[in-house]
């Protein structure tokens, strides 16, 4: 994994931890509207998403190399005016969470992803490997990593909006 990809993951996760660290239970579980997730649910969704991304990346690493993987415009995920429907496997639980439990889940999923990336052979080029994404189709693995960071940024903005409305 190159330093840019690592930096993206590190930066987005640090921002997420920073915006949720001081939340009390009321703020953590407040739902601005019935169809809007709470901050706890957003964090659970990020955990579930990272697990799915890690599995896709791990499987993609084992595949053969490809020469011409088309780079997709993954930046549309940062547009908060565009709504996406999450697949069931990354839809959060409605069960209440403790902040410490969410932090543990987020640390666990990030550790698992980093372990997959660190364990791969040093001669593997992530831009020559791919995996199928449900929205974007075939994505190079370096774009999967970038998308994970962009997705997290999208939800950080959502969390900040919820926090602002509560203060």
Residue ranges with predicted function:
Residues 1, 9-46:
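Long, hydrophobic N-terminal alpha-helical segment
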Residues 4-5, 11-14, 122-125, 145:
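Metal-centered catalytic cores of metalloenzymes
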Residues 6-9, 39, 102-106, 145-148:
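Hydrophobic packing residues in well-ordered alpha-helices of helical domains and bundles
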Residues 21-33, 89-93, 97, 111-144:
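Acidic interhelical loop/turn segments
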Residues 30-77, 126-167:
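Short, contiguous alpha-helical
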């Amino acid at each position: 994994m190159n330093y840019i990809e690592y930096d993206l993951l590190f930066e987005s996760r640090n921002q997420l931890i920073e915006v949720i660290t001081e939340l009390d239970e009321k703020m953590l579980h407040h739902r601005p509207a019935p169809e809007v997730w709470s901050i706890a649910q957003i964090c659970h969704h990020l955990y579930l998403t990272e697990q799915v991304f890690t599995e896709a990346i791990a499987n993609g690493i084992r595949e053969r190399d490809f020469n011409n993987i088309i780079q997709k415009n993954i930046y549309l995920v940062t547009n908060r005016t565009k709504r996406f429907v999450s697949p069931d496997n990354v839809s959060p639980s409605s069960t209440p969470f403790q902040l410490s439990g969410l932090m543990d889940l987020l640390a666990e999923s990030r550790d698992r992803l980093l372990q997959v990336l660190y364990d791969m052979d040093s001669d593997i080029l992530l831009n020559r490997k791919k995996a199928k994404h449900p929205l974007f189709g075939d994505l190079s693995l370096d774009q999967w990593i970038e998308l994970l960071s962009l997705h997290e940024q999208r939800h950080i903005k959502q969390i900040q909006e919820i926090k602002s409305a509560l203060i």
